[in-house]
Amino acid sequence: MTGSIWAIVPAAGRGTRFGGPLPKQYLPAGGQPLMAYTLAALAAHPALAGIMVAIAPGDADWPGWTAVQSTPVLTCLGGASRAASVLAGLLALPESVRADDFVLVHDAARPNLALADLDRLLEIGRGDPVGAILAAPVRDTLKRAGDDGGIDGTEPRERLWRALTPQLFRRHQLIRGLTEAAAAGVEVTDEAMAMERMGLRPLLVEGAEDNFKVTTPADLARFEFELVNRGLGARDPESAHPQSSVLASAFSGPGSRVSGPEEI
C-alpha cells in the first residue's frame, strides 16, 4: 500500500471542557505533547501521504512540526468550530489531492489509535463508494432521563454505536456535506453526520474501545497510565506509541508552512 491518503487533524479548539490555559492537544503525556502521539499513530501507516493540521490563528503552542516519521505535516488556519476547521483543512490540501480521493479526519486529542484499526478502516472504507468510520458498539444499558432527573425509560442498544475517529470520506463529498450543513446553520458533530444529511450511508467499522478522546483530566491520566504500562510506549512493530525519545526524534521542525484562507 503506497502513501496516497491525506489526514486532516482539526486542532484549533481550546478544549474548554478540560480547563486550564493550555489546549488539551498540547498537554504533556509521557514527556511529549498529546498530539504527538496522535500524529505518530497516523504516520505509522504506509498509506499516509501527509497530514494537514488545522490550528488556531496565532497558536503559540504549535511546535512547528514539518514531518513525522518522514510523513509531511502541513498546517492551515482552522475555524471557530470543528466542522469549519475540517473544511479549511480539506480546502488547503495540496493540488495533488484529487476531488474523489479519500481523506481521513482524526481528532487531535485521540492519541490511542491502533495501527490495526486504521488498516481495517482503510481496507473496508476504500471499498465503499461513500466511506466509513471507526465506531464501537454501545455495550452499557441506556436510560432516558426526565426533566426531574428521574428515569423515564430504557433505550434499546442493539443497533447503537459510538462514533470514533478516524473517519474516511471522499474529499469532494465531505466538502459538499460540510458546506451545505454550514449554510443550513446545522452544527455537525462529526463528519459522518454531514454525509448523513446528504442521504449517504457510511459504513461502521468496529474499532478498539481504548481509542478514546481525551476530554477530561481523568482521560489524560488514563492515557499516561497506558504509556507507563508500555514503558512510555516502548513498542513492537504493531504498536502506534514509540518510546518518548524515539517519538521526539521522529518529528521534524520548526518552520511548518501555515496557510490562511487567502491562500486557498
UniProtKB/Swiss-Prot annotation:
The record marks 17, 24 as: Transition state stabilizer. One of its GO terms (biological process) is isopentenyl diphosphate biosynthetic process, methylerythritol 4-phosphate pathway. It catalyses: 2-C-methyl-D-erythritol 4-phosphate + CTP + H(+) = 4-CDP-2-C-methyl-D-erythritol + diphosphate. Its EC number is 2.7.7.60. It holds the Pfam family IspD. Belongs to the IspD/TarI cytidylyltransferase family. IspD subfamily. This is 2-C-methyl-D-erythritol 4-phosphate cytidylyltransferase. It comes from Xanthomonas euvesicatoria pv. vesicatoria (strain 85-10) (Xanthomonas campestris pv. vesicatoria).
